[in-house]
């Protein structure tokens, strides 16, 4: 299946010069959604990635991470922007092109030696995925790899990630 055909391009969003890759059209296709999740599962299995938990990054990582976790018989853990989780959290700060940002995870979400797979809809510069991996590693988890639907290859995001398996289904 041609997933690119199911991803809508929106020029100049959210600002001029940006080509936004809109996955809502993919999500709207039952066949496309099933193919996407099945493809992620197949690639994880072929690389022997068997997580205890799938970690989805806010917010579109939730859309693909939860069905992937279900199919892989794993738990799902959200990593969120600050102030979105109600219980005590662990936090990691990371650099953006113009400033800083941070991510949080519930303190009781993971335990040392949990095997985790990090999922998001898209990898661009890799900063968010890298920060998520650093946080989980600091908490004693074994990060097995990363899974993305879209990879913006020109931004070299995979270069900043740890030397682990990286799955991406569509490359721009």
Curated annotation (Swiss-Prot):
Gene3D superfamilies attached here? 3.40.50.2020
- PROSITE patterns reported for this sequence: PUR_PYR_PR_TRANSFER
Please give the catalytic activity noted in the UniProt record: AMP + diphosphate = 5-phospho-alpha-D-ribose 1-diphosphate + adenine
Give the matching Pfam families: Pribosyltran (PF00156)
What's the Enzyme Commission number for this chain? Answer: 2.4.2.7
Pathway(s) served:
Purine metabolism; AMP biosynthesis via salvage pathway; AMP from adenine: step 1/1
* HAMAP family the UniProt entry points to: Aden_phosphoribosyltr
Oligomeric state and partners?
Answer: Homodimer.
Q: Which family does it belong to?
A: Belongs to the purine/pyrimidine phosphoribosyltransferase family.
What's this protein's function? Catalyzes a salvage reaction resulting in the formation of AMP, that is energically less costly than de novo synthesis.
What is this protein's record name? Adenine phosphoribosyltransferase
Organism per entry: Synechocystis sp. (strain ATCC 27184 / PCC 6803 / Kazusa)
Please state the gene responsible for encoding this protein.
apt
